[in-house]
């Protein structure tokens, strides 16, 4: 017996790219990530823990490589870029877990982040930096 839910789901997945014309995938810029985004994860801000303290080698979605005494190696930066990219919807910062989880819920952040809140508002300079990167800034 055929499972109709699976048939409907499969049809929706196949048809989705055709709805509304072709989708243009926006790429995330690796150079901009290294220069502007990755440093945010290790920067100490008063009243906040560095992201890498909880996420350095952690067993969660944002598993960051920890830098050595001379900073991040190229291999570490590439791994961090790959990890972080999975938490981003290119062109849509307000749908990207990377920005929503550490944002306070009152400002639209996710209630499911069990860690600290890094950003009290979307106007926070670091939130804005990551949002610009997600929007394609190079």
Q: Could you say what each language-model-derived stretch is?
A:
Residues 1-11:
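Bacterial N-terminal signal peptides that target proteins for export
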Residues 3, 17, 50-53:
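The N-terminal extracellular segments of secreted preproproteins, especially immediately downstream
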Residues 10-18:
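Bacterial N-terminal signal peptides
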Residues 23-138:
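Aromatic- and Gly/Pro-enriched helix-to-coil junctions and flexible linker segments
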């Amino acid at each position: 017996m055929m499972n109709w839910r699976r048939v409907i789901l499969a049809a929706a997945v196949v048809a989705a790219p055709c709805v509304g014309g072709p989708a243009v995938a926006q790429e995330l810029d690796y150079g901009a990530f290294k220069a502007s985004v990755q440093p945010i994860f290790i920067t100490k801000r008063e009243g906040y823990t560095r992201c890498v303290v909880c996420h350095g080698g952690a067993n969660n979605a944002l598993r960051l490589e920890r830098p050595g005494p001379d900073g991040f190696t190229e291999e570490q930066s590439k791994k961090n870029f790959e990890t972080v990219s999975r938490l981003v919807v290119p062109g849509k910062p307000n749908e990207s877990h990377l920005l929503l989880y550490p944002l306070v819920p009152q400002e639209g952040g996710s209630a499911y982040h069990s860690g600290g809140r890094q950003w009290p508002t979307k106007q926070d300079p670091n939130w804005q930096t990551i949002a610009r990167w997600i929007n394609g800034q190079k």
